[in-house]
């Protein structure tokens, strides 16, 4: 079976082609209810539609750019636009309508933009200020703005009501056939036996169908609500906005035309808009148009489209068009209907259901044929003249109903749906544990993870950074909480240079918030440096206003430094500042400021002193940054790059980023669970090693290597080196990508990778599970990731792994349980039909059994919470079989036991219990049915553990399991004792009840004994 499944029902956890997804669906030939079976599979037609939309967008944008360029050449000769403001827009106080705004940005219409007075003109017409943003003082004006220009939300499919799920559950082909059987049974029964005696069989089937439908619909409806809640969490995106004169964080769904949005590397453009100011802005439009070539956005080409990504630079943007008025809104509405890819387990279990369904269908046909043949043989024995009565018709109908119900029981439609149920349950619980699963498959894949490649900053450490040591002007000092002593020790000219560098060469900002308090905005590293500047007496706004910024090169993981070129107020001199990785920036310096504040050549002795200082700081687990400047003598153009060499070193700062509490224990837990943790960081190797030792990642037999050294290795050297690598420092994004790819392809590892920046995208994409940071992560990283770690904590990653293992094992438990029921129900009814000419389990009884094993069984077993024992096992890995030898052992062992018990009852039951009289067969069949159900109840308990003997451990922690077992027993008593007329049962004696329970219970020690058999 496994080889057939691997060749036909094997999909990747990520990036499966549409052809592969189509293939397995076409192989699912025995499907009772396609609407329900394929509800949680991707809608491929909607994906094709979205791809076509991207191609259309690409062509429209290409034409718009060409037209815009042509128009720009003749713009001075064109007469003013005859655009007229609609009356309702004018009455609301605005001078431009939403359609006109949309046509300007979407059409890249430079001509129209010019006619409306450029970006400043449009800002005025929208009653907004480029500096202060929107004013929302008047609620009426705000609601008018929303009414005229729309809100920044995309069209979503309506929440389906409970009755829709009831209707879908009724689409089950076998239930429909049984419904027809029930209807015919009612007609024939009433015609022959009268009302109400003749209606019992038919009404029994109808009641069973309705019960199955409502229980199924309730389960599906609850799942849909869980997925809806998770979907809302996925869409929570915030941006930095200036509104009412204050910079603040705001949900993208609250944005309105006229808002001023601040964008930086890794952000997603939240609406259509226009560039106000900024530097080196490069936009990736591939998500909208499919075009891979990045676009430079400047004052000359100011158009920013919703859904595109900031690849480089930073800027302020004026929002012009929102929501469904943008091309991104229309694309997202289509894509949301495309759905998630199916998970590998869902597809594999669809394969299992198909195989067993075909077997079950064959058994059902043969069973029906044998039962009908038996009936004909009885007729023949009565003589050549046949007489067909209403009872004969009812008997034939009952045979057909039994055959159909065998298909109901034999086609384990619940297998793939149990995966969805388990994943929905796990994802909901993981949200409480600060992990947001974006793709279903990631949850189950994480259970197989063998390696975690983790960032250092913010994941293993707290990301609360402070400068604790410095070496300014060759003078090493501890930085106290109040830096007055440091300030007095720095020469005045050097202090001025230092503050100029800190406040101009930064991606952060110091603002006054709505409460009138000073607030630092930016990354933790930027915040630490800005705090140092403020403590040294610097004033952010004064410094920024006194210099004119000419060029900014933001920090990225490849260069490992950032730079700025400014024009000084005195004499228009040009100065460049840079800061970044100490070794890299120091290598770009040829001069240094000494303790007297003089600029002197950087000789060997000074270089040695500074390198020793860097190593000392790093060995104390401090992140080190080197700060440097240079005066540019000749003229400098914004089109030029910032010089690479010739800088003067001002100093080095050591930033403390403490290790998170509990990380060492989590790393040790991973090691015991067979998961190798590797640190991949851009930091200095000594800093990385110190932190790695503190976390327990770097062991005596492990290797710490620098990225530049790693990338020089050939394939043969890598094969020997990679298994031992525990720390990679000074790594570039491509080093990370190479390591992940080698681990996956060469060493067959299942790799989870953390990332927070735009440059982590290749590694996140390549990994089996991409983990993005919720706090420090950029929108680009979050969008490409499979799981978002909301608290940026490594311990949460371990929790995700635990939940992943729990999902995988829970599904295995359910599959083991359901296949046991399938095998026994099939063989019992088939063999009984062949040997005795009758079936001991009726259609109504089989429907009840089907509900026990399908919906209720999935609820009980697929929602088991994880326990600590899960992290003491080795991971399944990439090549592990889903249906293991241990599972087959348990399935076949239990099936044989149950089959023997039922056959003993069929053969010797009447004599064992002294059953005589006309109702002896009914009592015996009721006893067989009762024993069969209790075998399933106790087997469900035994299935809680596939290898362990103690199946009661933690049973009370899973209240769903307890409720399901209790409800099953309760309704079984009701069916036997009170619903005999409809279920073809009769009340049992106390001895017969105890016997049924004992037979079921006896399956537990047998299950325990089976677990002792090695496989």
Swiss-Prot record:
Modified residues (N-acetylmethionine): 1
Location in the cell: Membrane
Residues on Cytoplasmic side: 1-161, 222-349, 418-811, 863-882, 940-957, 1012-1015
Binding site for Mg(2+): 756, 760
CDD domains in the cross-refs: P-type_ATPase_Ca_PMCA-like (cd02081)
GO cellular component: plasma membrane
Function: This magnesium-dependent enzyme catalyzes the hydrolysis of ATP coupled with the translocation of calcium from the cytosol out of the cell or into organelles.
Lineage: Eukaryota, Viridiplantae, Streptophyta, Embryophyta, Tracheophyta
Active-site residues, Swiss-Prot/TrEMBL: 455
Chief site of localization: membrane
Free-text comment on this protein's domains from its UniProt entry: The N-terminus contains an autoinhibitory calmodulin-binding domain, which binds calmodulin in a calcium-dependent fashion.
GO molecular function ontology, one term from the record: metal ion binding
Keywords of this entry: Acetylation, ATP-binding, Calcium, Calcium transport, Calmodulin-binding, Ion transport, Magnesium, Membrane, Metal-binding, Nucleotide-binding, Phosphoprotein, Translocase, Transmembrane, Transmembrane helix, Transport
Any one Gene Ontology BP term: pollen development
Class of the enzyme per the UniProt entry, highest EC level: translocase
Transmembrane segments: 162-182, 201-221, 350-369, 400-417, 812-830, 842-862, 883-905, 918-939, 958-979, 990-1011
Lumenal topology ranges: 183-200, 370-399, 831-841, 906-917, 980-989
PROSITE patterns named in the record: ATPASE_E1_E2
Catalytic activity, as annotated: Ca(2+)(in) + ATP + H2O = Ca(2+)(out) + ADP + phosphate + H(+)
Superkingdom to which the source organism belongs: Eukaryota
Stated name of the protein: Putative calcium-transporting ATPase 7, plasma membrane-type
Phosphoserine: modified positions: 45
Region named Interaction with calmodulin: 20-31
Family from the record: Belongs to the cation transport ATPase (P-type) (TC 3.A.3) family. Type IIB subfamily.
């Amino acid at each position: 079976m496994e080889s057939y499944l691997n060749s036909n029902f094997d999909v990747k956890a990520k990036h499966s082609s549409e052809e592969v997804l189509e293939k397995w669906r076409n192989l699912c030939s025995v499907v009772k209810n396609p609407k329900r079976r394929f509800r949680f599979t991707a809608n491929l037609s909607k994906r094709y539609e979205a791809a076509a939309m991207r191609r259309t967008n690409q062509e429209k944008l290409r034409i718009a750019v060409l037209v815009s360029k042509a128009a720009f050449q003749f713009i001075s000769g064109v007469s003013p636009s005859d655009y007229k403001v609609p009356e309702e827009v004018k009455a609301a106080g605005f001078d431009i309508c939403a359609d006109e705004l949309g046509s300007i940005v979407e059409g890249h219409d430079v001509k129209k933009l010019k006619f409306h007075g450029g970006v400043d003109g449009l800002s005025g017409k929208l009653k907004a200020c480029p500096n202060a943003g929107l004013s929302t003082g008047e609620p009426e004006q705000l609601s008018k703005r929303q009414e005229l220009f729309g809100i920044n939300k995309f069209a979503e499919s309506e929440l389906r009501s409970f009755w829709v799920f009831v209707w879908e559950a009724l689409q089950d082909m076998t239930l429909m056939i049984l419904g027809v059987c029930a209807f015919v049974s009612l007609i024939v029964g009433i015609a022959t036996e009268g009302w109400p005696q003749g209606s019992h069989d038919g009404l029994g089937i109808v009641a069973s169908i309705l019960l199955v439908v409502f229980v199924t619909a309730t389960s599906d409806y609850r799942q849909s609500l869980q997925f809806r809640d998770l979907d809302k969490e996925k869409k929570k995106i915030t941006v930095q906005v200036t509104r009412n004169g204050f910079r603040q964080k705001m949900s993208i769904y609250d944005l309105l035309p006229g808002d001023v949005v601040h964008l930086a590397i890794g952000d997603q453009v939240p609406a259509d808009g226009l560039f106000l100011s900024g530097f080196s802005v490069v936009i990736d439009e591939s998500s909208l148009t499919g075009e891979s070539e990045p676009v430079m956005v400047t004052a000359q080409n100011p158009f920013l489209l919703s859904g595109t990504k900031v690849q480089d630079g930073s800027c302020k943007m004026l929002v012009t068009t929102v929501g469904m008025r943008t091309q991104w809104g229309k694309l997202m509405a289509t894509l949301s209907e495309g759905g998630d890819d199916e998970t590998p387990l869902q597809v594999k279990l669809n394969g299992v259901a198909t195989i067993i369904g075909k077997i079950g269908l064959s058994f059902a046909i043969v069973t029906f044929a044998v039962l009908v043949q038996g009936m004909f043989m009885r007729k023949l024995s009565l003589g050549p003249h046949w007489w067909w009565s209403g009872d004969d018709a009812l008997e034939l109908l009952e045979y057909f109903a039994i055959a159909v119900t065998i298909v109901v029981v034999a086609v384990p439609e619940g297998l793939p749906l149990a995966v969805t149920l388990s994943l929905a349950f796990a994802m909901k619980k993981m949200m409480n544990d600060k992990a947001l699963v974006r793709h279903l498959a990631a949850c189950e894949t994480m259970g197989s993870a063998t390696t975690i490649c983790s960032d250092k900053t913010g994941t293993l450490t707290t990301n609360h950074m402070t400068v604790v040591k410095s070496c300014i002007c060759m003078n090493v000092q501890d930085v106290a909480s109040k830096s007055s002593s440091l300030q007095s020790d720095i020469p005045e000219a050097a202090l001025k240079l230092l503050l100029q560098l800190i406040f101009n060469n930064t991606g952060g900002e110091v603002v006054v918030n709505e409460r009138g308090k000073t607030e630092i905005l930016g990354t933790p590293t930027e915040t630490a440096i800005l705090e140092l500047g403020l403590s040294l007496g610097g004033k952010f706004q004064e410094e920024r206003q006194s210099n004119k910024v000419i060029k900014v090169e933001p920090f990225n993981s490849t260069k490992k430094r950032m730079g700025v070129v400014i024009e000084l107020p005195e004499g228009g001199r040009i100065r460049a500042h840079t800061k970044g990785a100490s070794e890299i920036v120091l290598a770009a310096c040829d001069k240094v400021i000494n303790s007297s504040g003089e600029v002197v050549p950087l000789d060997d002795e000074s270089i040695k002193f500074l390198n020793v200082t860097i190593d000392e700081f790093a060995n104390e687990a401090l992140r080190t940054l080197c700060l440097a400047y240079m005066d540019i003598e000749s003229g400098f153009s914004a089109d030029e790059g910032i010089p690479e060499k010739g800088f003067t070193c001002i100093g080095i700062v050591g930033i403390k980023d403490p290790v998170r509490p509990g990380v060492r224990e989590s790393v040790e837990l991973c090691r015991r669970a067979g998961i190798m943790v590797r640190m991949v960081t851009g930091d200095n190797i000594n800093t990385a090693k110190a932190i790695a030792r503190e976390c327990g990642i770097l062991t005596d037999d492990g290797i710490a290597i620098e990225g530049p050294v790693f990338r020089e290795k050939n394939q043969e050297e890598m094969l020997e080196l990679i298994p031992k690598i525990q720390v990679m420092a000074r790594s570039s994004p491509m080093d990370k990508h190479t390591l992940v790819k080698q681990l996956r392809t060469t060493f067959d590892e299942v790799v989870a990778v953390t990332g927070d920046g735009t440059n982590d995208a290749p590694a996140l994409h390549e990994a089996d599970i991409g983990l993005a940071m919720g706090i420090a992560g950029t929108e680009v990283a979050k969008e490409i990731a499979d799981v978002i770690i909301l608290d940026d904590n490594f311990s949460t990653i371990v929790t995700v792994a635990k939940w992943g293992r729990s999902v995988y094992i829970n599904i295995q438990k359910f599959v083991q349980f359901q296949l046991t029921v399938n095998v026994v129900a099939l063989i019992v009814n088939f063999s009984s039909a062949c040997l005795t000419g009758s079936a001991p389990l009726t259609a109504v009884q089989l429907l009840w059994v089907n509900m026990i094993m399908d919906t209720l069984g999935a609820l009980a077993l697929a929602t088991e919470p994880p326990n600590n024992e899960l992290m003491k096992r080795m991971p399944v890995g990439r090549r592990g079989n889903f249906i293991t030898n241990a599972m087959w052992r348990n399935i076949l062992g239990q099936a044989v036991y149950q089959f023997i018990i039922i056959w003993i009852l069929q053969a010797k039951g009447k004599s064992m219990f002294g059953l005589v009289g006309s109702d002896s067969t009914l009592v015996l069949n009721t006893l067989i049915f009762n024993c069969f159900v209790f075998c399933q109840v106790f087997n469900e308990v035994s299935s809680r553990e596939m290898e362990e003997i103690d199946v009661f451990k933690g049973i009370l922690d899973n209240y769903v399991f307890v409720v399901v077992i209790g409800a099953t027993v309760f309704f079984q008593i009701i069916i036997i004792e009170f619903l005999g007329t409809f279920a073809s049962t009769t009340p049992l004696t106390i001895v017969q009840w105890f016997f049924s329970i004992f037979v079921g219970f006896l399956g537990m020690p047998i299950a325990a004994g089976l677990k002792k058999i090695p496989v």
